[in-house]
Amino acid sequence: MADEGEVSALMCDNGSGMVKAGFAGDDAPRAVFPSIVGRPRHQGVMVGMGQKDAYVGDEAQSKRGILTLKYPIEHGIVTNWDDMEKIWHHTFYNELRVAPEEHPVLLTEAPLNPKANREKMTQIMFETFNVPAMYVAIQAVLSLYASGRTTGIVLDSGDGVTHTVPIYEGYALPHAILRLDLAGRDLTDYLMKILTERGYSFTTTAEREIVRDIKEKLAYVAIDYEAELATANTSSSIEKSYELPDGQVITIGNERFRCPEVLFNPGYVGMESAGIHETTYNSIMRCDVDIRKDLYGNIVLSGGSTMXPGIADRMSKEITALAPSSMKIKVVAPPERKYSVWIGGSILASLSTFQAMWIAKSEYDESGPSIVHRKCF
């Protein structure tokens, strides 16, 4: 942690599914909550409750029966700024319990985030929250830093979007970044669908949360999909039981690996796009021939949707099949990859060399929101 008397920076990673926030220098985020804002469906039905016009995060989640829930971040990009402001307000005042005007704030953005979005983010931080300094970093770059590298290709797959981001000497290569609109939320939807085919009914948003839990606890990636299906059909070795909140116990078999298989075969959910292995390969092929070897040897997985057991081995197998035969392939799956964007930000914001990189309020007052393009790249 920072020295006494020194003001610690705040690190906030805004994902499509979860917000991860905390203090730079810490080894894990203090606050992790859903990126949702809920508004009452009916005015004044809740007797004796101080009616709030909006609920954020876990509180919105727990009162979801009487609220309309919205995700202000879609596919990694902020689409609803009023709700986003509510999320940041909740992060600073309720979760971290700090005054934002007293701390520099490091925020994250999706790769290829539109310029206007970074400016809006900058403007809200300085004008609404009066922060003394701020910086915007690309999520995948922070994940790479967290793995102790400055060159490599990051496959970052969260709840709302997946990106492959080649990075050389600390700089993302924008022409080679690829985006795949297939991520955790789609895997949950697919698992709901295949469990329904098995005769279990999951339809509501509340039930979706149960299925998400089943996915997180039981899903895994098969090294050989066809062989695994054959095994599943002939034996019950992969079957696991799961207890629903009402006490009913359900059995889940081949769904365990059919669910994350979608990442390698998006066709299963009707998407005509390449799987994560092919997208990673395509991304590498868009880079200069001289740096490809460094990328093949440093494929770093990041984000919650890369947490399924077996994913690194399968990824390694698939990319080895695509790459030149003499190429050395290394897929790295750090155990803390669910939070590696946050951890990378925590590391970056506490480096002494980074202190000159912050955008100060004085610079913002002089240049306006466009300062972000000159100082954050």
Curated annotation (Swiss-Prot):
InterPro entries associated with the record: Actin (IPR004000), Actin/actin-like_CS (IPR020902), Actin_CS (IPR004001), ATPase_NBD (IPR043129)
Record-level GO cellular component terms: cytoplasm; cytoskeleton
SMART domains: ACTIN
Pfam families: Actin
Leading EC class: hydrolase
Main localization of the protein described in the UniProt heading: cytoplasm
Sample GO molecular function, one term: ATP binding
UniProt xrefs under PROSITE patterns: ACTINS_1 (PS00406), ACTINS_2 (PS00432), ACTINS_ACT_LIKE (PS01132)
Reactions listed under catalytic activity: ATP + H2O = ADP + phosphate + H(+)
UniProt-annotated location(s): Cytoplasm, Cytoskeleton
Tagged with keyword Translocase: no
Keywords recorded for this protein, A-Z: ATP-binding, Cytoplasm, Cytoskeleton, Hydrolase, Nucleotide-binding
EC number per UniProt: 3.6.4.-
Functional note: Actins are highly conserved proteins that are involved in various types of cell motility and are ubiquitously expressed in all eukaryotic cells.
Similarity field: Belongs to the actin family.
Name of the protein in question: Actin
